[in-house]
């Protein structure tokens, strides 16, 4: 049995691309993304691979991030079900193609809401805070 029953392939455009686009975080119980459920956030993609090939129906996967559009260029990889991120059933292991670490600060974003320009960090930081808290809760148990 594999950790993730999927394969990643070269993107449909068959070339390296770097662009800023939107993701939706569906309801999920993953360690890093659970608290972001329902959010729509901007993010960078920068790679030539990463097209999720998902041969089973979508509900067979623990999808934690989806591109806002199903077609190119909004789904730059051509991923099935416009999936941008997926995680293991227990929520601990994440596979994601966009680069959330490149969208942590508002100045890194190609667009950021005017009414939030005073933010020191974007909501993406929450994924890293969640991971740290998860580790701390388990590392210091007696």
Q: PLM features: residue spans?
A:
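Amide-donor transfer/coupling interface in amidating biosynthetic enzymes
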Residues: 10-142
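Single conserved hydrophobic/aromatic residue that forms the stacking wall/gate
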Residues: 1-8
